[in-house]
Design a protein with these regions (language model features):
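Solvent-exposed loop/turn elements at secondary-structure boundaries
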Residues: 340-343, 471-488, 492-638, 769-771, ...
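Transmembrane beta-barrel strands of outer-membrane/channel proteins
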Residues: 144-150, 188-192, 275-279, 320-326, ...
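Acidic, glycine-rich flexible loop segments
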Residues: 34-302, 312-314, 326-330, 339-347, ...
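Residue-level signature of outer-membrane beta-barrel architecture
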Residues: 133, 178-179, 265, 310, ...
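Short, solvent-exposed micro-motifs at the edges of structured domains
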Residues: 168, 468, 567-573, 580-890
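Hydrophobic, lipid-facing positions within transmembrane beta-strands of outer-membrane proteins
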Residues: 82, 127, 140, 168-174, ...
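Repeated loop/turn-to-beta-strand initiation elements of outer-membrane beta-barrel proteins
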Residues: 184-186, 270-275, 315-318, 378-380, ...
Length: 890
């Protein structure tokens, strides 16, 4: 623990807790900082001074690098419950934020042609083709800070058994700016975050009478015993939730490091050059509630930029930049992992999942140029950007092997595990190292035209071609062509109606996304260089060898394919807003934002097993009942989904009224898709989330609410600065200068789907794929919010559903027709700065996240065949936390 942290905990914790209790009693609310679009990082006072030096935004880094330990407290976010694990690659952090918090309906005032706005209507930051850094502040300036959080002041999460385990978090750093020589300014920013904690969570483990193998063969018994011994020795202690529920703890450590260096040089009266290098890393020694459950992760990011700016005259500026980005990700199994990935219905899986290990390096070489010129009533801009993308490394697809134990063969899944009788085995063998290359480009031009004092127009055209990826050693050939017709027009206007009626604004634009690397790289897993084999009802001891009775199992390869017509996803985004000028002290906005997204990525699971005359409809005969008897699944990536989003939003900003700042927003929205949203990569978990019950009529079967849909959302932020209070002198001296701020976030819960939980006869359609849903018996339960552990089973009774017959194609229950519990969160902070001498200041800040210790419940058990169906067993957030910051700035 750092010296500053020790001082804080020896002298201030009890008093700070009392202050926050008083704040809660008074009902103070909301931080008046400008709202950050989700997702973003929690910002304390120690971080804000760094931003003008053009440190890459923490929001972007959090999503790009999948950083843990970050919370956007200013937007009402609570600290996430770390026991809801996701692999720290791809865009998994963004998807976690969307499902856990939902999205923020965002009205973009105007579309800058230099930026890409795909997904911006949901609150995501636009992607810029060129970044022009703001100048470094003049003079000698800097700051030193330390933020500390400790389990001493942390409340238990809702389901936690026993006290909070010892944990602490330190976030400390410094930044410094000064003139190094004539017309040259230097800036450095260095920080570290050390998290040493204990993750609490519920896992499903065998009951006392399920801990012994039921198999007698010594070799098979050894494997079954190894699987069973991977579960904690502790017995279930939350049998009120589920007969197998165990609440337990496991240690986790996270190290985050960041360094940012800038040098700005003025070259004469017209030219300036900025050089920047930024390094970010994260190392995660993951928690293991079950032995080997989660991978350990090392992530490193390097960013280098050179930006040359030339002012030709007072009206024309050109900018040229060249940059290099490198992101490396290494995910590896923990040493106690059992080897293969083992999934048992009714128990926590033995991981990590089939994509581990993973070793990936991504390089981007960027160059861009831009010109802006003002000519009379026109403000012209044009630019060009070119990016060379390189991705190298090893990716896996159950190369460690995968066993599935399901409710099958007339008994439950745990009994099948104890008997060593899996329903399915999948394994991949082959060369998994690849190197892919492609070019991205942007060419754009636009104009801001002031038609008259009351009307402004904005219009632009952006061309965003994407070339066909290539594999450097020609080991794989991408079947689709380069996408050359990605034209993206945009238009906007601002019209002042009258003095009191204010301004009417509108904007429309076409915006393109991307075909993700993780999407097209899957072709590496197809024959002939790689074979993914599926065996039904295998022999546990030798799943690819001879089975019972000396018979060789029917093992078939899985094919990964890309649609030859695969194209870049895009969206039409539009908004209309009215900003009346009824009061000079307040800003009010009424608005609508909508989008229609097309060609969203999804994976279709084809060549499934179908009812065949004369062949029993059982798990053992799945491979015999496929249309193409030579292969197992044919997994085809297509532009198979569309997205629909509409939202109405009203916002009120009251800045600086007698020390009071208020920022409040409410939005009413609806998001629908055909199984895949704008974040779907059509890979692994994403592909299964978008998998239909049957291979036919996929879009009809999957149409429903998006995973991040929320009907209502309300964000209220308020801060108050005590100054010149009319109190006795001593009290006024103690109170004046303190700033109290609070953030209140209230949102509808996001939706979830009830599934059958098994593809086996008596549960599913026995087609070799999961995703089956039951039939609905009681339609009155549709749309229910399952938000209370005490009533969840009553609100979602198993009697309201019925398993389908083995020969039925699908169940009639829709996708995402129920909702998990809502978000009710309050964050608060108290801070004050003291000035000493010239420009020297000292700041103390105390913050609480989830001030009222309100749980945000996860969805209940949603697999009808499992004993925990309908039971809420987890929360999406942590309990109340406090943290304290000391900062010295000059």
């Amino acid at each position: 623990m750092s010296p500053i942290s020790i001082i804080l905990f020896n002298r201030g914790l009890a008093r700070a807790a009392f202050v926050f209790a008083a704040i809660a009693t008074l009902g103070l609310s909301a931080d008046a900082q400008q709202q950050q679009t989700q997702p973003a990082q929690e910002k304390s006072s120690s971080e804000k001074a760094v931003e003008p030096e053009n440190k890459q935004s923490e929001a972007d880094k959090r999503v790009e690098m999948n950083l843990l330990g970050k919370t956007n407290a200013a937007a009402g976010e609570n600290r996430r419950n770390e026991n809801i694990q996701f692999n720290l690659v791809n865009n998994n952090a963004l998807k976690d934020l969307n499902v856990r918090l939902g999205t923020t309906a965002t009205i973009v005032r105007e579309f800058d042609p230099a930026n890409g706005y795909f997904g911006a209507e949901f609150g995501n930051a636009p992607k810029s083709s060129i970044s022009v850094p703001p100048p470094i502040k003049s003079g000698f300036h800097g700051q030193l800070y330390d933020t500390h959080q400790n389990s001493v002041t942390t409340a238990r999460s809702f389901f936690q058994v026993g006290g909070v385990k010892p944990a602490h978090e330190n976030d400390y750093g410094f930044n410094l700016g000064f003139v190094v020589w004539r017309n040259a300014k230097f800036f450095i920013d260095v920080s570290q975050q050390k998290i040493r904690g204990s993750v609490n969570g519920n896992v499903l483990v065998p009951t006392p009478d399920e801990r012994a193998p039921l198999v007698t063969d010594p070799a098979t018994l050894a494997i079954v015993a190894r699987f069973l011994n991977a579960y904690p020795k502790e017995l279930p202690n939350r049998t009120d939730i589920d007969p197998r529920a165990l609440n337990t703890n496991a240690p986790q450590s996270i190290d985050n490091n960041q360094a940012n260096i800038r040098l700005d040089q003025v070259l004469g009266s017209k030219d300036s050059v900025a050089l920047q290098y930024q390094f970010t890393s994260q190392s995660v020694d993951a928690f293991q509630l079950v032995a080997g459950q989660n991978p350990d992760t090392d992530t490193k990011s390097h960013l280098a930029r050179i930006v040359w700016t030339r002012s030709w005259d007072a009206k024309t500026i050109t900018t040229f930049s060249i940059g290099y980005d490198r992101l490396t990700s290494l995910l590896r199994p923990e040493e106690n992992a059992v080897g293969p990935f083992v999934s048992t219905s009714g128990l926590t899986s033995l991981g990590p999942d089939g994509t581990i290990p993973l070793n990936r390096a991504q390089n981007q070489i960027r160059t861009a140029t831009q010109i802006r010129s003002t000519q009379g009533a026109h403000d012209w801009s044009a630019g060009f950007g070119l990016t060379r993308r390189q991705v190298n490394g090893d990716e896996t697809d159950v190369h460690r092997g995968f066993f599935s134990f399901a409710n099958d063969f007339g008994v439950d899944a745990v009994t099948n595990l104890r008997m060593g009788r899996p329903s399915q085995y999948i394994a991949s063998i082959g060369d998994i190292h690849r190197g892919f290359r492609l070019w991205d480009a942007q060419l754009y031009a636009g104009d801001k035209f002031q038609v008259n004092p009351r009307l402004n127009l904005v219009y632009s055209l952006r061309w965003q071609p994407a070339t066909k990826p290539t594999e450097v050693n020609n080991l794989n050939v991408i079947p689709y062509d380069s996408d050359w017709n990605n034209l993206a027009p945009s238009f906007g206007f601002a019209y002042r109606i009258s003095k009191k009626l204010g301004v009417l604004r509108g904007a429309y634009g076409v915006h393109y996304g991307e075909i993700f690397f993780v999407t097209y790289q899957q072709i590496r897993f197809s024959p002939p260089l790689n074979t993914k084999t599926v065996v039904t009802a295998p022999n546990l001891l030798d799943p690819l060898g001879t089975g019972a009775g000396g018979q060789i199992p029917l093992a078939l390869p899985t094919i990964y394919a890309l649609d030859p017509k695969l194209a870049t996803p895009y969206s039409h985004q539009y908004n209309l807003s009215w900003e009346p000028d009824w009061n000079k002290s307040a800003r009010l906005q009424f608005g609508y934002v909508g989008s229609r997204s097309h060609k969203l990525l999804s994976m279709w699971y084809l060549n499934r097993a179908h009812p065949t005359p004369g062949v029993p409809q059982t798990t053992e005969t799945i491979n015999q009942r496929r249309s193409d008897p030579e292969i197992a699944d044919y997994r085809l990536v297509v532009n198979g989904s569309r997205g629909y989003f509409d939202a109405a939003r009203v916002s009120l900003v009251l800045p600086g009224w007698k020390g009071l700042n208020i920022d409040a927003s409410y939005w009413f929205s609806k998001a629908i898709d055909l199984g895949s949203s704008y974040t779907n990569t059509a890979n692994e978990i994403d592909s299964r989330k978008g998998r239909s019950q049957n291979e036919f009529e996929t879009q009809r079967d999957m149409k429903g609410l998006s995973d991040f849909d929320q009907t209502h959302a309300f964000l209220w932020r308020m801060s108050y600065l005590f100054r010149q209070t009319k109190l006795p002198r001593l009290m006024s001296t103690l109170i004046d200068g303190w700033n109290i701020s609070t953030v209140v976030l209230v949102k509808t819960g996001t939706p979830f789907t009830v599934g059958s939980g098994s593809d086996a006869p008596g549960f599913g359609n026995v087609d070799g794929n999961g995703g089956d849903r039951p039939n609905l018996v009681d339609p009155t339960i549709l749309g229910r919010t399952i938000a209370d552990p005490d009533t969840s089973r009553q609100l979602l009774p198993s009697s309201s559903f019925q398993f389908i017959n083995p020969t039925d194609a699908r169940g009639d229950l829709g996708r995402n027709v129920f909702r998990k519990g809502p978000i009710h969160n309050v964050n608060a902070s108290l801070h004050r700065s003291w000035g000493f001498k010239k420009d020297l200041r000292f700041t103390f800040r105390a913050e609480s996240i989830n001030l009222f210790n309100t749980p945000q419940f996860a969805e209940p058990g949603f697999d009808l065949s499992n004993p925990n169906f309908g039971a809420i067993t987890n929360t999406l957030n942590e309990g109340r936390t406090f943290r304290f910051t000391l900062q010295i700035g000059w």
